[in-house]
């Protein structure tokens, strides 16, 4: 190795050594059964290091947070009203996986649409349609992955809900 190599390598090593070490957690899916035929596995690994909120009304405690699972499809939109129809998300506790759960939609998810004649000049676009009207919320837990099996062609999206710190009184009747 020549002196030129050291001149090039030394600054790179110093930069790498000064960067904070970040451990990348391994995704442990032991204890989960294989997806049933026709289903695809989707996995969410919530981070234990979410950015802190500047809003004092938002709880900083993960015990007050929830993960919303959003099952849906990206569909071509036109002048017709479209929505998804299919079985709702179900949860199955896994005894061999100590407290972990498997979520699943176990049937076909269909796009229902009105059948109006659309103007050919009208703009078309894609939109994500979600299955079901009510949010499907589960406790936030950075220790376990969220495992969801869905029919082919269906996607999973998610977001975190955080509770307010203040509690409000109800009216007693």
From Swiss-Prot:
Cleaved signal peptide residues: 1-23
Source organism of this protein record = Synechococcus sp. (strain CC9311)
Recorded GO terms, molecular function?
A: serine-type endopeptidase inhibitor activity
Q: Which family does it belong to?
A: Belongs to the protease inhibitor I11 (ecotin) family.
Instruction: Write the protein's name.
Output: Putative ecotin-like protein
Name the domain of life: Bacteria
Task: List the keywords (alphabetical).
Answer: Signal
The record's InterPro entries line, in alphabetical order, gives: Ecotin_sf, Prot_inh_ecotin
């Amino acid at each position: 190795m020549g002196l030129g190599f050291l001149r090039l390598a030394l600054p790179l090593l110093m930069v790498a050594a000064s960067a904070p070490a970040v451990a990348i957690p391994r995704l442990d899916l032991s204890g989960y059964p294989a997806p049933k035929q026709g289903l695809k596995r989707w996995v969410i690994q919530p981070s234990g290091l979410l950015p802190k909120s500047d809003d004092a009304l938002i709880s900083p405690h993960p015990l007050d947070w929830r993960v919303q699972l959003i099952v849906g499809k990206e569909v071509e939109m036109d002048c017709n009203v479209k929505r998804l129809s299919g079985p709702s998300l179900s949860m199955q506790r896994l005894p061999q996986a100590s407290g972990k759960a498997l979520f699943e939609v176990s049937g076909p998810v269909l796009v229902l649409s009105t059948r109006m004649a659309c103007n050919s000049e009208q703009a078309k676009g894609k939109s994500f349609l979600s299955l079901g009207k009510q949010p499907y919320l589960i406790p936030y837990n950075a220790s376990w992955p969220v495992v969801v099996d869905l029919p082919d062609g269906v996607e999973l999206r998610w977001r975190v809900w955080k509770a307010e710190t203040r509690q409000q009184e109800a009216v007693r009747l």
